[in-house]
C-alpha cells in the first residue's frame, strides 16, 4: 500500500509541471523583437507609415488554454516615428495624439477568442488620447520554445484597425484617411 501511494505521489509530481497554468512573459524590448507599426492613408493617394519606438508590456499565455490569455501594453506616444521630424511634431500635437496631455496609450485585454490553428481574437480596451474604447486584435500565435540563451520565448503577430474620431482625434484628413491600421509583432520572454 505504501509503495502504491508513493508511486502515485511521484507520478503526480512529475505530471504537475505539464498541467501548469499559463506562463507569464515580458515583451522583449531589449532584443528589439517586437514592434508596433501603423499605416494611415495619405489623402487616398499613398500611405504614411510609422512606428512607436518605446513601449512595454507583458502577457500570460498557455497554448492548451488560449482563451485564458491576458495582455497588457503601454505605449509612449511621444516615441511616434514616421521618419519625418516635422510630421512627427504634428502627430504629437493636439491635432492627433496630444502627447503633452496624454503621453501614454494602453491596451488591456478583456477576453480572448480561440479561432483554431493559432488564430486568436484578443478583445480589450485601448486608451488613446484620453479616450478608452473596446478594440479587437486579430492575432496569430507564431510559435514558442527554448532560445539559445537558456530562456523560453513565445511570439505573436496581430492586426487591427480603428477610426481616429473614436478616440477624440478631430483632425479631418478626408474619408480616405479616417482610419489607422496597426501591425503588431510581439515576442515575449518567459519570466
UniProtKB/Swiss-Prot annotation:
Cellular localisation: Periplasm
SMART domains per UniProt: YceI (SM00867)
Gene3D superfamilies associated with the record: Lipid/polyisoprenoid-binding, YceI-like
GO CC annotation terms, alphabetical: periplasmic space
Keywords: Periplasm, Signal
Entries under InterPro entries matching the protein: Lipid/polyisoprenoid-bd_YceI, TTHA0802/YceI-like_sf, UPF0312/YceI
Any Pfam family the entry gives: YceI
Source superkingdom: Bacteria
SUPFAM superfamilies listed in its UniProt record: YceI-like
Signal peptide residue numbers: 1-22
Protein family membership: Belongs to the UPF0312 family. Type 1 subfamily.
Cross-referenced HAMAP family: UPF0312
PANTHER family reported for this sequence: PROTEIN YCEI
Name of the molecule in the record: UPF0312 protein Sbal195_3198
Organism from which the protein derives: Shewanella baltica (strain OS195)
